[in-house]
Curated annotation (Swiss-Prot):
InterPro entries: Spore_YhbH (IPR014230), UPF0229 (IPR006698)
Origin organism lineage: Bacteria, Bacillati, Bacillota, Bacilli, Bacillales
HAMAP family xrefs: UPF0229
Name this protein carries in UniProt: UPF0229 protein RBAM_009260
Family: Belongs to the UPF0229 family.
Length: 394
């Protein structure tokens, strides 16, 4: 709207859809990014930029299946002529480049003579990444335990009123109310909006009893666990920790590191400090049983032990490990063992665990980075139990 020389206002009309073109393009791009994230989850969960982000809200991750569009110079200046067989359709290939193939981009130890593969580095919200990952995960075999006397208070927006805080205006219901009132006067429109049209979302305080769970995160930090093995184990525990704290109200996590001896450590030390020495896995199982006896009564807690190692255990200790694992399973909902074994070498610990015959025992062997995602799905797969998670809060 503009003013002419005579002082009157003129109303001009234009195609406002053109103003949305940039927004629509952005929306389409974001949708492609989300689809690429979902399709590349097995590779993205072990990206170093995420694991080392310390929980930052936004991280940059490479998405190799998504092209970043740009103009590229055509180095092949030859002209090509193609001829079909007479019944070709749009999109059919009628000719191919006859130029000799070059060596290509360098891979492995050899040097290549071509440019490398470009990939798109996207800024992704850690919350969006977690949403894509956690929607398939759930604590398995979750059971109803003896309730604590403690209850927690939650807020639920479950009512609509005519008065309330400005920040809680329900825009959709307000506009519908205005439209209905204006329609009754013969002028159906969203404008004007009067005070009596305003609708406000309001909340109620809801108290819910707590049923608790504890996860025992056990990691081998001995000398046989190299940089890659520790990175794989910590990647798993990084996502496990974020998953538990995102989806569950009350869950305790105990971090236990071990070599020949086991000790409870802080979360920061668990994810940062390295140690050396030999490997006696029974030490970490004894420490877990001590924690259960001292702090976590099985009658009141759902107990989930997770142990990650490279499987290189003292051979004479394997029989003790099997006995202690069976003792732990009598008090826990599940026992999960993850073995980082990149080269498929002989594992003394895994050979002993093959004799464990209990439905509560689950294991996964990780040979490559994408196996972290598969291990999460395997260990946190929802299984039928006496009481489902949806029936009560944890």
């Amino acid at each position: 709207m503009s003013r002419n020389d005579s002082g009157n206002f003129l109303i001009s009309e234009e195609d406002w859809s053109l103003h949305r073109k940039g927004f629509d393009d952005q929306q389409r791009h974001q949708k492609k990014v989300q689809e690429a994230i979902k399709n590349n989850l097995p590779d993205l969960v072990t990206e170093e930029s995420i694991i080392m982000s310390n929980g930052k809200d936004v991280v940059k991750i490479p998405i190799r299946s998504l092209d970043e569009y740009k103009i590229r110079y055509n180095y092949d200046k030859n002209k090509h002529v193609g001829q079909g067989d007479g019944d070709s359709e749009v999109g059919d290939v009628v000719a191919r480049d006859g130029a000799d193939k070059k060596q290509g981009a360098g891979k492995g130890q050899g040097a290549g003579d071509q440019a490398g593969e470009d990939y798109y580095e996207a800024e992704v919200s850690l919350m969006d990444l977690e949403e894509a990952l956690f929607q398939e995960l759930e604590l398995p075999n979750l059971q109803q335990k003896e309730r604590d006397n403690i209850v927690h208070t939650d807020i639920e927006f479950n009512d609509i009123r005519k008065t309330g805080l400005t920040g809680n205006i329900d825009k959709k219901r307000t506009m519908l109310s205005a439209y209905k009132r204006n329609a009754m006067t013969g002028k159906p429109s969203f404008y004007p909006i009067y005070p009596e049209d305003l609708k406000y979302k309001t909340w109620n305080d809801v108290t819910k009893p707590e049923s608790k769970a504890v996860v025992l995160a056990m990691m081998d930090t001995s000398g046989s666990m190299g940089v890659w093995e520790k990175y794989m184990a910590r990647s798993f525990f990084f996502w496990m920790t974020r998953f538990l704290r995102t989806k569950y109200e009350t869950v305790d996590i105990e971090f236990i590191a071990h070599h020949t001896e086991a000790k409870v450590v802080s979360e920061e030390d668990f994810f940062s400090k390295g140690e050396s020495g030999g490997t006696i896995c029974s030490s970490v199982y004894r420490k877990s049983l001590e924690l259960i006896d001292e702090k976590y009564d099985p009658a009141r807690y759902n107990i989930y032990p997770f142990h990650f190692s490279d499987g290189d255990n003292l051979t004479s200790d394997n029989a003790r490990c099997v006995k202690l694992v069976n003792d732990i399973m009598k008090k826990s909902n599940l026992f999960c063992y993850g073995e980082v074994n990149q080269y498929n070498r002989h594992s003394t610990l895994m050979s002993a665990y093959k004799n464990v015959k209990d439905d509560k025992f689950k294991y996964y062997i990780l040979k490559q980075k994408s196996d972290v995602f598969q291990a999460l799905k395997s260990f946190f797969k929802n299984e039928e139990s006496g009481v489902s998670k949806a029936s009560y809060e944890i």
